[in-house]
Amino acid sequence: MADKKTIGIYKAYLKEHLSKKRYTHSMNVANSAVELAKRYGADADKAYVAGLLHDVAKEIPALELAAIVSKSSLDVCDIEKKAVPLFHGIAGAELVQTLFDIHDPEIISAIRYHTVACGNMPKLSQIVYLADLI
């Protein structure tokens, strides 16, 4: 999936835009996601990227998040548009597409839904959801 240089770009962005605590959390989620992916037969490279970037939008101010969500190319329902705690997942899924040109549907889904479980979650989404909890 992503080479070391690309991963370095992701990490540099996160270091610049997240608190040290949030960055460490993102690294831990990425590593846990890899272990879960190996155990449950998912793509470990995708798990690492999705885990690393799952909170890319976590520390963006609420008004900015709302603007990203309102302009999102993703299918966002009315309930989601009113649920501020969900904004960082939706905005994060949007941002990785625009900032990093990531368009893999599994990665986008895993980032978008990492805060809430949804019906028929793809395996990678389940993995990142769980990795974020442990």
Q: Predicted segment positions?
A:
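Non-catalytic interface/linker regions that flank or bridge core catalytic/transmembrane domains
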Residues: 1-4
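Divalent metal-dependent catalytic cores for phosphoryl transfer on phosphate-bearing substrates
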Residues: 9-17, 34-134
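N-terminal glycine-rich anion-binding loops that anchor highly charged ligand groups
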Residues: 24-25
